[in-house]
């Protein structure tokens, strides 16, 4: 595995596979977050998945496991995907930032939101994942993911439920991060927000199906 000092600069070696990309990500020292994290957490899923989900960053459990969305937020995501009839095995899941940013509170490691510099420094890895997977639709889970993908700060409520287009033409949607649902105390509000989250995932599947049908029609014509 490359030493961290090898990847402090902006030059990234040629990468041919997701497994190779994961190793290079784990050697990343492009921002200081690697110093306090256990490891980088690369994306995971089908190499040519049609749907990519992008979260903010790994949480405590993800940092320890080295896999994305395996903690409480991941459980919410799995349930929502199932209700939207989207097999997680058919999806590529990743994060805008690959290292866990946190602060110590006693013996606990509490999440801290990545800043603009950290998001930008980590963007190269997300772009390489997108280049390799080539998803037809990308769903940004939360404001950090949306900022990384769109290149600007966004307000989720203003963009939610709308089909967007990234600079390369890829279809994109913006929704909440599943961890947001874990923080809602009011039961009625939590139920409503969860239903909307599932609806957002269903919309992504609908866009996928519609675009695939349109492409098939063009081939026949």
What does each of the following model-derived ranges do?
Residues 2-221:
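A polyanion-binding, active-site-adjacent surface
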């Amino acid at each position: 595995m490359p030493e961290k000092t090898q990847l402090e600069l902006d030059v990234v070696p040629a990468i041919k596979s997701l497994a190779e990309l994961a190793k290079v990500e784990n050697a990343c020292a492009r921002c200081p977050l690697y110093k306090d994290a256990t490891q980088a957490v690369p994306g995971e899923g089908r190499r040519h998945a049609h749907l990519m989900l992008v979260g903010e960053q790994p949480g405590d459990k993800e940092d320890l496991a080295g896999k994305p969305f395996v903690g409480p937020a991941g459980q919410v995501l799995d349930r929502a995907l199932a209700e939207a009839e989207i097999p997680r095995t058919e999806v590529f899941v990743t994060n805008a930032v690959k290292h866990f940013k946190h602060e110590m509170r006693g013996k606990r490691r509490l999440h801290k939101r990545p800043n603009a510099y950290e998001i930008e420094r980590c963007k190269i890895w997300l772009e390489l994942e997108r280049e390799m997977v080539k998803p037809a639709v990308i769903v940004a889970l939360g404001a950090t993911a949306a900022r990384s993908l769109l290149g600007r700060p966004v307000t989720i409520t203003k963009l939610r439920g709308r089909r967007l287009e990234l600079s390369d033409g890829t279809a994109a949607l913006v929704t909440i991060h599943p961890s947001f649902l874990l923080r809602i105390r009011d039961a009625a509000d939590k139920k409503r927000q969860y239903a909307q989250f599932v609806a957002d995932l269903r919309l992504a599947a609908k866009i996928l199906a519609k675009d695939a049908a349109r492409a098939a029609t063009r081939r026949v014509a």
